[in-house]
Each structure stands twice: as C-alpha cells, then as structure tokens.
From Swiss-Prot:
Homodimer. Catalyzes specifically the acetylation of the epsilon-amino group of a highly conserved lysine residue in acetyl-CoA synthetase (ACS). This acetylation results in the inactivation of ACS activity and could be important for mycobacteria to adjust to environmental changes. The keyword DNA damage does not apply. Pfam families: Acetyltransf_3, cNMP_binding. It comes from Mycobacterium tuberculosis (strain ATCC 25618 / H37Rv). One of its GO terms (cellular component) is cytosol. The lineage of its organism: Bacteria, Bacillati, Actinomycetota, Actinomycetes, Mycobacteriales. Changing residue 185 to A: Completely abolishes the interaction with the aliphatic tail of the substrate lysine. This is Acetyltransferase Pat. CDD domains: CAP_ED, NAT_SF. It is an enzyme of class 2 (transferase).
Length: 333
C-alpha cells in the first residue's frame, strides 16, 4: 500500500505542475492520478490521428509534439504542444472524431487516460471550464481568416483572437502609442501582464474577441464581455494601432462584433469611454447612442446590437463573419 501511495503522490506532484491544473489543490488530483497511465514516446511517433475515434487524452510532462489539422480546403494548420499541455481533449468534449494529428517532435513523456479518467478530470473544480476555454481557443486556430479590404485598398485579415496574440502584440513591430492605450484603458499606465493575459484568454462565449491582422501582426481588436447579471448585455471595447486609425477599421469592427453578438445571444451593447474619444463616440452615435456622464471625463451608453441591415458590410461579408463566429462560439457544447 505504501508503494501505491508513493506512486500516486509522485503522479499528483507531476500533474499539479501542469498548466491545465494550475491553482488546483493537490488533494483534488488524487483520483485523476490513480486513473492515468505513464506515457513514453520516441521522436516521430504518431500519438493521435485526425479522423480516428476519440478514446483517450494525453497530458505532456516533457518533450513536445506537432499538432496538425487539415481543413476541408486541404490546407494544413500546424501548432505545437508543449510540456504542461493537454491534447486529445477536444474530441472527447465534442464526442466526435479526432480534429488533428499529434506527432512527437522529440522524446516525450506524460500521462494518458481514457474516458473514465477524462470524466474524473472534468469534475475537478475549475478544470472543466478551463478545458472548454482551451478547446475553443484551439479550434479557433483551425478557422480560416476572412480577407478584409479597406477603402484605401489595404488588405488585412479578420479572425478570432488566439492565445499567442498577447506576445505578438507586446513584442511585434506594430505601435500602440501612449495616447491610444490611454483612450482604451482610461489610464496612463501601460497595461499589466495580468491584464494582457486576461484580454487574450477568452472563451468566445462570454468573452469574444475579433482581431484584425496585417500579416501576422495584430493591428486592431474588438471585444464584447457579457454582463454577469444580464446575459443579453455585453460591454464592448476597441483598440486600433496608431498607423491604422482613421481608415474605417473601427466601423468595420463594430459590424463584425454585432454579427458575432447576435450569434451569441447578445441583444444590447454597453460602452464606457473617455468623453474625448471622438472616433469611438462617432461610431456609437451612428447607432443611436445616448450618453450619460459616469465620472469626470468618463461617459457611458447602451445601444441595441445593430442588425445586418444597419451595418456597412456587404451581404457576403456578413455571411462570412457569421459562419466564422458560429464555428468558434458553437465549437464545444
């Protein structure tokens, strides 16, 4: 018995260090530790294959793997699974065939479990919600971005936010000036790492974000965050990089956000901003905004989510945005 307890304790310690279990008390991992089995794989080994039935999941302790998804258009999208990550959970959550092929890049160790272990893991406090969020983020990476052509001919892309956008925004070459950040966050201080993490870690249901990119760099984003007391209301916010301001991106994004909101059951948009944020006020005024003063220099408003007929978007663009929004919002039930 002592040997079994010691083995389980070692597994609990290893599991507790993984991202998916961050913040979970060790005692909550005991049942899971008893239901998973050790995994060791050589470089180049296929662990999961796209299209196959889902019967297990993997937790990576060391090493890395390539995650490859081939879309209906035949284009392969490649990602990487690193230590601390879980793979194989999407198909189990959706009760569907595998959505990607996972191949080890180097020798890999970890843990594997079946449906029983997965059920145990989902019921660990906080883990189920984290798995749903992670699954939606991964599925969002498989969505093809929507080409967007601005009035001046600039070609950009629209897509849902992805986890790596925080690093791409912070370390990219696109500049967001102090004035732009002040208007967005209503503070002269640079956004903290914790806030930047929150802004990029979304679930696409209660917190949805569109990102506009130029190449691989995010140049603008628009988000809605659902009200905790009234799920039909969501607060919206926009950020556009300095070099891209005044080119119609904000007007386009409120249209894209409105389409996604209607898919998600949001009926009204709330906005809170600095009173001198004229570009955003102008956009909101087009949809009947009535402003209230909340504090010195801060105003608020509430508008109905604009319908397709009110948006400055073509029918084809609305349909594309609707399809992509539905893909990520309804990705995991």
């Amino acid at each position: 018995m002592d040997g079994i307890a010691e083995l389980t304790g070692a597994r609990v310690e290893d599991l507790a260090g993984m991202d998916v279990f961050q913040g979970c008390p060790a005692e909550g991992l005991v049942s899971l530790a008893a239901s998973v089995q050790p995994l060791r794989a050589a470089a180049g080994q296929v662990l999961l294959r796209q299209g196959e039935p889902a019967v297990s999941f993997l937790l990576i302790s060391s090493g890395s793997a390539e995650v490859s998804h081939v879309g209906d258009d035949g284009v392969a999208i490649i990602a990487r699974a690193l230590p601390g990550m879980i793979v194989g959970e999407i198909a189990l959550l959706r009760d569907s065939p595998r959505s990607a092929t996972v191949t080890t890049i180097e020798p890999l160790t970890g843990w594997t479990g079946g449906r029983g272990a997965f059920a145990t893991m989902v019921h660990i406090p906080g883990v189920g919600e984290r798995l749903l969020r992670t699954a939606r983020q991964r599925l969002a990476a498989f969505v093809s971005p929507i080409p967007v052509r601005l009035a001046d001919g600039t070609q950009l892309m629209l897509r849902p936010v992805l986890p790596g956008d925080r690093e791409r925004t912070v370390h990219g070459h696109i500049q967001f000036s102090g004035e732009t950040l002040y208007r967005r966050f209503m503070s002269a201080r640079v956004p903290s790492p914790a806030l930047m993490h929150y802004l990029s870690e979304v679930d696409y249901v209660d917190h949805f974000v569109w990102v506009v990119t130029d190449g691989s760099d995010p140049v603008a984003d628009a988000r809605f965050v659902r009200d905790e007391t009234d799920p039909t209301v969501a607060e919206i916010a926009f950020t556009v990089a300095d070099a891209y301001q005044g080119r119609g991106i904000g007007s386009f994004l409120i249209g894209a956000l409105s389409v996604a909101a209607r898919v998600d059951g949001v009926e009204r948009f709330a906005a809170r901003m600095l009173s001198d944020n004229v570009p955003m006020r102008t956009i909101m005024d087009r949809y009947g905004a009535v402003w209230q003063r909340e504090d010195v220099g801060v105003i608020t408003t509430m508008i109905d989510v604009p319908g397709p007929g009110e948006l400055s978007l073509g029918r084809e663009m609305v349909d594309q945005i609707n399809r992509v929004a539905r893909q990520v919002i309804e990705a995991v039930g």
